[in-house]
From Swiss-Prot:
<dbReference type="GO" id="GO:0051085">
    <property type="term" value="P:chaperone cofactor-dependent protein refolding"/>
</dbReference>
<dbReference type="GO" id="GO:0005737">
    <property type="term" value="C:cytoplasm"/>
</dbReference>
<keyword id="KW-0963">Cytoplasm</keyword>
<comment type="subunit">
    <text>Heptamer of 7 subunits arranged in a ring. Interacts with the chaperonin GroEL.</text>
</comment>
<comment type="similarity">
    <text>Belongs to the GroES chaperonin family.</text>
</comment>
<dbReference type="GO" id="GO:0005524">
    <property type="term" value="F:ATP binding"/>
</dbReference>
<dbReference type="InterPro" id="IPR037124">
    <property type="entry name" value="Chaperonin_GroES_sf"/>
</dbReference>
<comment type="function">
    <text>Together with the chaperonin GroEL, plays an essential role in assisting protein folding. The GroEL-GroES system forms a nano-cage that allows encapsulation of the non-native substrate proteins and provides a physical environment optimized to promote and accelerate protein folding. GroES binds to the apical surface of the GroEL ring, thereby capping the opening of the GroEL channel.</text>
</comment>
<dbReference type="InterPro" id="IPR011032">
    <property type="entry name" value="GroES-like_sf"/>
</dbReference>
<dbReference type="GO" id="GO:0044183">
    <property type="term" value="F:protein folding chaperone"/>
</dbReference>
<dbReference type="GO" id="GO:0046872">
    <property type="term" value="F:metal ion binding"/>
</dbReference>
<dbReference type="InterPro" id="IPR020818">
    <property type="entry name" value="Chaperonin_GroES"/>
</dbReference>
<keyword id="KW-0143">Chaperone</keyword>
<dbReference type="GO" id="GO:0051082">
    <property type="term" value="F:unfolded protein binding"/>
</dbReference>
<dbReference type="GO" id="GO:0051087">
    <property type="term" value="F:protein-folding chaperone binding"/>
</dbReference>
<protein>
    <recommendedName>
        <fullName>Co-chaperonin GroES</fullName>
    </recommendedName>
</protein>
<dbReference type="InterPro" id="IPR018369">
    <property type="entry name" value="Chaprnonin_Cpn10_CS"/>
</dbReference>
Amino acid sequence: MKLRPLHDRVIVKRLEQETKTASGIVIPDNAAEKPDQGEVLAVGPGKRNDKGDFIALNCKVGDRVLFGKYSGQTVKVDGDELLVMREEDLFAVVEK
């Protein structure tokens, strides 16, 4: 199944979190915090302005982004957990 976000929404896949600390301690799944970074998989066309034209989003497919722990709505697609959120829920684009 493929999702196509509407309006100013983006679809993000959380990046995998490290399961081991720098000192070698293994963190169990139930104790680990959800990662707050992800990769943008799809973007909507944007919001409309007063004239009815779309205002393009500031992020694009493939961008690595930062977001809040509780941002977005979690959905399962083909066994993957994805987040659907508004662009305004994104804090930043991580530049390489």
